Amino acid sequence: LECHNQQSIQTPTTTGCSGGETNCYKKRWRDHRGYRTERGCGCPSVKNGIEINCCTTDRCNN
């Protein structure tokens, strides 16, 4: 599986996920600088107030 891994509004980059990982994620939250976005492999659990979208196809988390 190949997932995007750039932060916020950086130029898109991707990474190959290891260990048979089958999910990509896109996590979004707001702090004092505005909205922040994190992307990567897996589907982590998040705290209240953090939006997360998980998906299962190559580069689906942009």
Swiss-Prot record:
Pfam annotation, one family: Toxin_cobra-type
Superkingdom of the organism of origin: Eukaryota
MF terms in GO: acetylcholine receptor inhibitor activity; ion channel regulator activity; toxin activity
Entry keyword annotation includes Secreted: yes
Skewed-composition ranges (Polar residues): 1-16
InterPro entries found in the cross-reference section: Snake_3FTx, Snake_toxin-like_sf, Snake_toxin_con_site, Toxin_cobra-type
Location of the region described as Disordered in the Swiss-Prot/TrEMBL record: 1-20
Stored PROSITE patterns: SNAKE_TOXIN
Keywords, comma-separated and alphabetical: Acetylcholine receptor inhibiting toxin, Disulfide bond, Ion channel impairing toxin, Neurotoxin, Postsynaptic neurotoxin, Secreted, Toxin
A cellular component term, taken from the record's GO annotations: extracellular region
Compartments it resides in: Secreted
Annotated SUPFAM superfamilies: Snake toxin-like
Tissues/organs with expression: Expressed by the venom gland.
Keyword Disulfide bond recorded: yes
Functional description taken from the UniProt entry: Binds to muscle nicotinic acetylcholine receptor (nAChR) and inhibit acetylcholine from binding to the receptor, thereby impairing neuromuscular transmission.
Family to which the UniProt record says this protein belongs: Belongs to the three-finger toxin family. Short-chain subfamily. Type I alpha-neurotoxin sub-subfamily.
Protein name: Short neurotoxin 1
